[in-house]
């Protein structure tokens, strides 16, 4: 399993099927970049200048919304993931 370092978080992106108002399903080339995902791994947290470690606010299993162009896409064990900093996470859903 991927284990992120520092304040990084591993996300499994949740793809949504996009349709136009008239019900036409858009091809992948016309879709917006996804911004929703599920947290699959969390680093130990951000280290402050004082050396203190600040624990992450998100947990494994959280559904989140993140910045559109944030993170690095990686492929591991046949699946695609996104590794991003906790500061790129905008909200936890639910």
UniProtKB/Swiss-Prot annotation:
One GO-annotated biological process of the protein: chaperone cofactor-dependent protein refolding
Main subcellular localisation: cytoplasm
A Pfam family the protein falls into: Cpn10
Keyword Cytoplasm recorded: yes
Record key words, sorted: Chaperone, Cytoplasm
InterPro entries xref list: Chaperonin_GroES, Chaperonin_GroES_sf, Chaprnonin_Cpn10_CS, GroES-like_sf
Gene Ontology CC terms: cytoplasm
Gene Ontology terms for molecular function: ATP binding; metal ion binding; protein folding chaperone; protein-folding chaperone binding; unfolded protein binding
SUPFAM superfamilies: GroES-like
Disulfide bonds: none
Compartments where located: Cytoplasm
Alphabetized PROSITE patterns for the sequence: CHAPERONINS_CPN10 (PS00681)
Family, per entry: Belongs to the GroES chaperonin family.
Subunit structure: Heptamer of 7 subunits arranged in a ring. Interacts with the chaperonin GroEL.
Task performed by this protein: Together with the chaperonin GroEL, plays an essential role in assisting protein folding. The GroEL-GroES system forms a nano-cage that allows encapsulation of the non-native substrate proteins and provides a physical environment optimized to promote and accelerate protein folding. GroES binds to the apical surface of the GroEL ring, thereby capping the opening of the GroEL channel.
Protein name: Co-chaperonin GroES
Source species of the chain: Geobacillus sp. (strain WCH70)
Gene behind this protein: groES
